[in-house]
Amino acid sequence: KYGYGRSLSGMVYAARRMGICMADSKAKPPRKHDRRYPELLRPGEKVQIDVKEVPYSCLKGAVKQDGKRLYQWTAIDEFSRYRFVYGFEEHTPENSVKFLKLLEAAFPFKIEAVQTDNGTEFTYRYISEEKECPFETALREAGIEHRLIPPRTPWHNGKVERSHRNDQRYFYDWERFGDVDELNHKLREHLEWSNRKPMRTLGGKSPMQRLHEALAV
């Protein structure tokens, strides 16, 4: 107590560095969202979709001068981590429908279910009991199940959220865009790289390798 000027946490840290095992004074409670989900067995069983607003610092030229914004739609197959991304100028349900059509053409497998948050680009669940969101109409017509995560629980869409953080780190921190065409041109190159990047969660394989192995069975 007397003659020691460091905090308890500092003392514990120093003891661990010297190889002295000390129990924590208080065990950390488990996080509420530390839970396991059912293992997926095939590509397309569940696809997470979300939208990322392109950072304002990445805009240049007319798109910035006119006060416009750009948005990245992202889909990630939970089984293989294989992704598809596309940029739009407006954050609307109609663009979600356009993205779905592009996604169906891009993914070489049948999409059985998609999982999204409760944003109005995906659902009118909390604003209208009578009017159906165009995105949900498109899903129903395509025979794709729509799963909605509980409100304010982004960790339920954790795979697409993490992929957006990687996009920020490896893409948006380095790129600038004058319009949506330039965004999509550069996104195509980034997508090719990210789908070929080895991942620890896939045992050192890339999403493309994981997908090809699954489709070859």
Model-derived segments and spans:
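Acidic/histidine-rich, metal-coordinating catalytic segments
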Residues: 91, 109-127, 150-152, 204-207
